[in-house]
UniProtKB/Swiss-Prot annotation:
Any GO MF annotation of the entry: 4 iron, 4 sulfur cluster binding
Main location: cytoplasm
Binding site for [4Fe-4S] cluster 1: C13, C49, C78
UniProt-recorded name of the protein: Ribosomal protein uS12 methylthiotransferase RimO
Record organism: Acinetobacter baumannii (strain AYE)
Subcellular location per the Swiss-Prot or TrEMBL entry: Cytoplasm
Residues holding [4Fe-4S] cluster 2: C147, C151, C154
SUPFAM superfamilies for this protein: Radical SAM enzymes (SSF102114)
Amino acid sequence: MKTPKVGFVSLGCPKALVDSERILTQLKTEGYQVASDYDGADLVVVNTCGFIESAVQESLDAIGEAMSENGRVIVTGCLGKDEDKIRQMHPNVLKVTGAAAYQDVMEAVHEYVPAPPKHNPFIDLVPEQGIRLTPKHYAYLKISEGCNHRCTFCIIPSMRGDLVSRPVGSVLEEAAALKRAGVKEILVISQDTSAYGVDTKYKLDFWNGQPVKTKFFDMCEALGQLGIWVRLHYVYPYPHVDAVIDLMAQGKILPYLDIPFQHASPRVLKLMKRPAHSENTLEKIKLWREKCPNLVIRSTFVVGFPGETEEDFQILLDWLVEAQLDRVGCFTYSPVEGATANDLPDHVPEEIKQERYERFMQVQQQISAAKLQKRIGQTMTVLVDSLEDEYPVAVARSYADAPEIDGNVFVEDIDKSTIQPGDMLEVEITDADEYDLFAKLIKIKSV
């Protein structure tokens, strides 16, 4: 009997990527092979995104391609919440499941492609850390599912439910397994990382025989004991985040915070129903930087939200200049089916959204460029992601750069025979542009 093969298409954010990794790990554990193309697959699983309309369309297109090339398709992920929409375009998909529905996906696979009856785990070993879709030297660590907030532009809670935190012992054991597998950097993700454990009332758990609370600070403190890079994403500026800044100042975890502020106008934040919108974020940023001077803050913003006036937008620009954030992403507001923001009055015309986006990015580019210029002459530790094919250059990142969303550090004039992805280098910064740094090698710190 030939080994059954399953094709896999993974779309969406890092949280969806982790869902894909878990499904692939289970498939491999049960003896399935992962097909490298549609033709060789007995069926195809498509993990979808449904956050904004462009992502919905990309997901529907991916389902269509899988149906055309293979014909046997199981759909999962955030868009799976809207089965009617999927079946309206692709009525012959085998099964539709929701986000993080690992067991439902496996049951559907079993129904259409039964697992091999005699799987030998010693022949087809699954690594302790599971199947990963990231490079070997970094990995995403998802600590919870869902969200308790009801931001008016977001439909994630309707897709993924309310906050459900993983037991901290499970989180820490996964992190330790990743380190044992050679991972140098862990990126902590969820819908609301700083709310971790709220739903469990900070339940006590155990790791390495020691009691640990299922709580944001306690988890970060324990992760800091691993001796590898720990990077925090999707953090809201709650008061208890202040204590984690102390861990950053002590060098326990990376001095890097990804905080989706989304806007600065109190009126717009109220329309968005953003959590912590009443916090004086500028004062908080100042306090954090006093505690940890090398702190890097990344954020994302939405311009052109319904009801946003020119005055609101100017408040945002002024805030941006004062905040001096290191890394910033910006999006024009896009209506999302099912979001309550669609019902708000005074939608902003597309041409004004675009004009505000361009003004926003122009201001932030100047800030980013000036901050990177100050790095010239500094010595930094960087993690190598890849080597350029045609040039003696290592593409790396410092503590200030998350993969894929931030800039890079290009280490020039290296001997490529001595360096590989996953190496830690000590470099001197020699130049900068709006987003990236350029450096020369001082020494290889670790391999």
